[in-house]
Amino acid sequence: MIRLDKICIWTLIVCFAGMIWSGSLVKPIDEMACYTLLAMGLMDCIVNHRWRAYRPLLLVIAIMAGYVVYSTFKGFNTLPYIVMDAIIELKPFVPFMVILVIKPQLNLTERRVLKGIAIVNIITVLVLYAMPVFRDYTLQLHLMFLGTTCFISMLVYLYCSIDEQGHVSPADMTAVLVMLVVGLGCARAKYYGEAVLAIFFLLLYRPGMSRGVKPGYWLLSLMVLVAVGMVSWNKFSYYFLTGNGDTIDPTVAETFARPVLYATSGLILLDHFPLGSGLASFASYASSAHYSSLYYEYGINNIYGLSESYPDFICDAFYPSLAQFGVVGVVLFITFLVWAFRPATRLLRLDPQRHRYHYVIAALAMCFILIESVASTMPMQTWGLLAMAIMGLVAAQAPATRAVQPSSVQLNHLITYRT
């Protein structure tokens, strides 16, 4: 007898254990985890006849297939690279949607294993902080990945520390905060913003604190937003306004890849309304692996990092790649984010005290994805996939919005089939 729920759990455990090395030594680990989860979902559909439960995932696949056809007619890249991009773009959706349906439940042993891996990850980060030459030149591991490793490890540790009543022990909360502090060593403005939000949700947030629109709540919210803005401003200015200079220079955008990507993505949304320029055409790995003709059309093929001879900065941020899907794609992506977060809000309404930390974890995972996507393709990488998986674990605990068939209830917590 094969238990699909346990295969899902151990797939996530292996992915979590290799997370810190997926930026250098074991890069295929995110593909391995994603394809394994997709195979589990397909097996669940075929063996347990649960096609209806996977309708959201099937809808995403159908939309992506439609974009493959559309992109072929647009003609900015060849079919193999269009298909490659479609597969890559599917990756963030698979962990959340498969886990949401299979609903794996962590037992005590699995929680201990995950907490142990989280601690090992933090120790490894500290060691790599102390070995900059080995880290930067031998492993070629960017400091950004150490910060994201700490943040995801913190979320996993917190999730595994919640007891049946929804409480987290003082010792575990201390460990969570220590993990958060260790991540500050990455010296990344994005992480500082995430850390400010994490401190707010972990130490200050209380369910229902916004009821009655109390002035204190709005003042606290404003202070958090100001703090996030302050710790993030230098990097925002560097990437989008001044570049290497000390003052705002309107001409500097022509010599820096990321501002050009963002500016051009806006033009593409207007010029290729409403469905965008198509897959493998802009700001994606496939559009750099086989250089897209769209870069010539917009005259950005000579920008440093965006040229055909040196395309290393093309796949540098997630949001510009949404221009490939047009206004329709942007609306669909926002709709997905809202839909994915709704189960966490249902949990909070169901039992605010028991599910407070589940809501916090989902909120922080969402914030992590949104912030990291500004200047990286994190949703497509191991850290982003694990963030989506964590949101899936939280969402799987929420009650369904409507009654399900008895056969589905029977399969909720134990997904099996006989060999």
Place the predicted regions along the sequence by residue.
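A membrane-periplasm/extracellular boundary helix in multi-pass inner-membrane enzymes
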Residues: 181-186, 203-249, 267
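Hydrophobic transmembrane alpha-helices and their immediate junctions
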Residues: 324-367
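Aromatic-anchored transmembrane helix interface
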Residues: 31-38, 56-70, 77-101, 116-118, ...
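Transmembrane alpha-helices of multi-pass inner-membrane enzymes
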Residues: 359-419
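Interfacial juxtamembrane loops and adjacent helix segments
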Residues: 281-318
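Transmembrane signal-anchor hairpin modules in multi-pass inner-membrane enzymes, especially those
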Residues: 1-69, 104, 108, 160-170, ...
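Alpha-helical transmembrane segments of multi-pass inner-membrane proteins
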Residues: 95-135, 141-206
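Helix-loop-helix junctions and helix-breaking kinks within/between transmembrane helices
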Residues: 19-33, 136-145, 170-208, 229-235, ...
